[in-house]
């Protein structure tokens, strides 16, 4: 199993895991800006607000992966605003696919499921960044010829996602009552990190 941060081009590092007693599986949490690729039978867990996750799987190779990202805001000069969001989104997808290929997956056999993009930051942000994230993932997968087998996107609620890597099964729980601001604070912090991301070519596309 490998993990990385989609802002970096460095090699992926081992990801801490825990045992999920409910599902009786090894599990790991995927935070905003991270991705995980694995050939082990395990549970990938993430909580999504306006961010999106793409669950990818090559069932023949028993290799799966999940990312958790949003597109940067276009709060920059007009030239950068026209190119940076797409460049970052492509990187978030390509780095996951590349790590899966290293584990034996074949890009031509991959299938996708997409989740998230809820309008959970309404009242904080003027634009619906969740809708923009979903549009990007759909367009990217269509262009790459990766079929989307299922999706649960948009709406106004955060989601907790459980991706069973070996079977490809996904359980989604919509969080209609939020008891603390952890989800929102993580996303706003991630958004600020993206706004400060350098535009000097440090994003590597495979």
UniProtKB/Swiss-Prot annotation:
The gene is cheD. It is an enzyme of class 3 (hydrolase). Probably deamidates glutamine residues to glutamate on methyl-accepting chemotaxis receptors (MCPs), playing an important role in chemotaxis. GO terms for molecular function: protein-glutamine glutaminase activity. Its EC number is 3.5.1.44. Signal peptide: none annotated. Keywords: Chemotaxis, Hydrolase. InterPro entries: CheD-like_sf (IPR038592), Chemorcpt_Glu_NH3ase_CheD (IPR005659), Cytotoxic_necrot_fac-like_cat (IPR011324). This is Probable chemoreceptor glutamine deamidase CheD. Pfam families: CheD (PF03975). It catalyses: L-glutaminyl-[protein] + H2O = L-glutamyl-[protein] + NH4(+). GO terms for biological process: chemotaxis. Belongs to the CheD family.
């Amino acid at each position: 199993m490998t993990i990385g941060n989609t802002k970096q081009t460095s090699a992926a590092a081992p990801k801490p895991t825990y045992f999920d007693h409910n599902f009786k599986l090894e599990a790991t949490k995927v935070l905003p800006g991270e991705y995980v690729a694995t050939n082990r039978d395990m549970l990938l867990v993430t909580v999504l607000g306006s961010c999106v996750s793409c669950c990818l799987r090559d069932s023949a190779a028993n290799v799966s992966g999940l990312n958790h990202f949003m597109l940067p805001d276009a709060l920059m000069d007009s030239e950068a605003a026209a190119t940076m969001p797409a460049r970052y989104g492509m990187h978030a997808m390509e780095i996951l696919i590349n790590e899966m290929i290293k584990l034996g997956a074949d890009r031509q056999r991959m299938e996708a499921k997409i989740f998230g993009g809820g309008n959970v930051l309404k009242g904080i942000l003027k634009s619906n960044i969740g809708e923009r994230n979903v549009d990007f993932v759909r367009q990217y997968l269509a262009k790459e010829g990766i079929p989307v087998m299922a999706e649960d996107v948009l709406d106004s609620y955060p989601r907790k996602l459980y991706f069973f890597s070996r079977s490809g099964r996904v359980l989604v729980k919509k969080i209609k009552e939020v008891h603390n601001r952890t989800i929102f604070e993580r996303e706003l912090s991630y958004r600020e990190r993206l706004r400060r991301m350098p535009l000097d070519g440090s994003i590597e596309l495979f």
